Regions:
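Residue-level marker for buried hydrophobic side chains located in beta-strands
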Residues: 64, 113, 125-127, 235, ...
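Di-metal (Zn2+ and/or Mg2+/Mn2+) metal-binding site signature of metallo-dependent hydrolases
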Residues: 120-141, 534-535
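Active-site core of metal-dependent hydrolases
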Residues: 208-397, 406-408, 414, 447-450
């Protein structure tokens, strides 16, 4: 890396290592500011009449993140400044005073506050679409990991798998105003009665959950999809693991070309055994993984058996329970899942928090997976210094940001770093990328981040911890965040929350081919025993990884 990188951040052509993943991020562009960089501090350019323009924030930014590595799943990689006004990104480019510098895109006024982004990486806040919010503390774990949008399906230690009655949803929403994340709730979709589904949608559910524990049958899947088409929300599907009422072929037939989000498509989290993975590769079936199987590791098979038994009310002393639990745990489909992610066939990652997944690990498991499959690439040893991993990095970034936003109809608000989007931004030090964020901005305001000893003379004195910032306190969370609802509910009245509400949009027309850096169509084959998986006839395999990136060096 150039000598310029230490004080001012990298320039075009520099390569940045992402933690211990082995992934190489190459800077493809930098704003034209060499020798005239905007800096703040003693004897720096951020002074009135030099780098600061004497103007009100009607002409300048409320907040600027300067000289940061901007990582957007659509626009790619560049070094620039991010301007924020009234909680939204107002521009990305060169920051400064146009009276004293050329080519300024973002005016830094004498009222503008500044976050020094030199050497940091900025990404959109993560979007976790599969959260069993059995404890309110799950939201702390989410934002601590860089997630700023959560779609949940419970509200406390109650068996639910999708919230049903208006009274329960109302209580949940009133409580969730306190959390500094965007929130949506999935209504109970496992019903053959459209009226019971309509009740949860009118109570401001943002989608529907069909689950085998409450019935994933021909009737429930079809009814949920018909209601989703009526209201324009997404259906999250956990298929029939016992194959009692439907096989995987039957489920595909019932879906009938309609858009649907297939949760934990590998199957360990639930679904048709042993071949639910055959749902991947269809243009209308939008697929995701939950994080415990990512990447496929040495102890994954043994770990999952205990989780399945506990989460689904099974008895380890009952042979039939152990038998059906073991049928869900297949090394071959776990290995193939990792490969299908790299091919762009599986489109999203999520946590399945407290329902067999970990709320705070989706970012790091997504990029640990990227590092593992990159290392397994047979051509990697032949790479030259000019090679980089930008395309792979951006593909995996899309899995946790823009693609879930598209699938759940909120991409008009979040999922990207681009003008007009809500300024939900995670800032990372490169050595901790995807493991622990340095600072999380919610609606353009610091809500969570690294903080030091509060009695120290400087703010970075050890011990350093990830904790709430001012944007997570008082009335700020509801001011900086939104509720994900649906148009039909909002037309009937406001939600019982102080925060603003947005309606899902475009959920029913989404296809895999619309997703960013994904959408490969083809045929996944799974043998009758679940021990061989193919993609368009080619066998998919991967050895279980013994050492997972972004783990021991970063957490223990």
């Amino acid at each position: 890396m150039t000598s310029h990188a230490r004080p001012y951040g990298p320039i075009q052509g520099d390569v940045v290592a992402l933690g211990d993943t082995g992934l190489r991020l190459r800077i493809t562009r930098r704003v034209d500011d060499e020798h005239d960089e905007f800096r703040v501090g003693f004897a720096k350019s951020g002074r009135d009449g030099i780098g600061l323009r004497g103007s009100t924030t009607t002409d300048s930014c409320d907040l600027v993140i300067t000289n940061v590595i901007v990582l957007d799943p659509v626009d790619g990689v560049r070094v620039a400044s991010i301007g924020i006004r009234e909680g939204r990104i107002c521009g990305i480019g060169r920051a400064g005073n146009p009276n004293t510098s050329d080519g300024v895109d973002l005016i830094v006024g004498t009222s503008t506050v500044v976050i020094d982004g030199d050497g940091l990486i900025a990404t959109p806040g993560g979007i976790d679409t599969h959260v069993h919010s059995l404890s309110p503390r799950v939201f702390d774990a989410e934002i601590s990991s860089g997630v700023t949008t959560v779609i949940g399906q419970e509200a406390g230690p109650m068996w639910g798998v999708g919230l049903g009655s208006r009274w329960v949803i109302d209580r949940a929403l009133r409580a969730m105003d306190a959390f500094p994340v965007n929130i949506g709730l999935l209504g109970r979709g496992s019903s053959s009665n459209p009226q019971s589904i309509r009740e949860s949608l009118h109570a401001h559910a943002c989608g529907l959950k069909v689950h085998e524990d409450t019935g994933s049958t021909l009737s429930t899947i079809d009814t949920a999809l018909r209601m989703a088409d009526e209201v324009d929300v997404q259906v999250a599907l956990h298929t029939d693991g016992l194959n009692e009422t439907l096989s995987v072929a039957d489920t595909i037939a019932v879906i009938g070309g309609r858009a649907i989000h297939a949760f934990h498509v590998e199957g360990c989290g639930g679904g048709h055994a042993p071949d639910v993975l055959r749902l991947a590769g269809h243009d209308n079936i939008l697929t995701s993984s939950t994080n415990p199987t990512l990447p496929y590791g040495l102890n994954a098979v043994e770990e999952h058996l205990d989780m399945i038994m506990f989460c689904h009310g099974m008895d380890a002393d009952r042979a039939s329970d152990v038998h059906i639990a073991r049928a869900r745990v297949r090394a071959a489909t776990m290995a193939a899942e990792s490969r299908l992610h790299d091919l762009g066939v599986i489109h999203m990652t999520s946590s399945d928090a407290q329902g067999m997944g970990r709320a705070g690990e989706t970012w790091w498991r997504t990029f640990a997976l990227a590092g593992v499959v990159a290392a397994a690439d047979p051509g990697r040893s032949e790479r030259s210094e000019s090679d980089d991993d930008n395309e792979r990095i951006l593909r995996y970034l899309a899995k946790i940001t823009v693609n879930p936003a598209i699938v759940h109809g909120i991409v008009h608000e979040v999922g990207r770093l681009a003008p007009g989007f809500l300024a939900d931004i995670a800032l990372w030090r490169p050595e901790m990328f995807a493991a622990k964020p340095w600072l999380v901005l919610k609606g353009g305001f610091p809500a969570w981040g690294v903080t030091g000893d509060p009695n120290a003379s400087i703010d970075s004195a050890q011990p350093l911890v990830l904790a709430e910032q001012f944007g997570a306190l008082g009335a700020a969370p509801s001011d900086l965040s939104f509720l994900i609802s649906n148009e039909q509910a909002l037309s009937q009245g406001p939600a019982p929350m102080a925060r603003r509400a947005i309606a899902t949009s475009g959920c029913r027309s989404i296809r895999a081919s619309h997703l960013v850096r994904h959408g490969e169509a083809g045929e996944v084959g799974v043998s009758a025993q679940g021990d061989v998986v193919t993609w368009n006839g080619d066998v998919l395999s991967l050895e279980p990884v013994r050492q997972v990136p972004l783990s021991r060096l970063h957490f223990w």
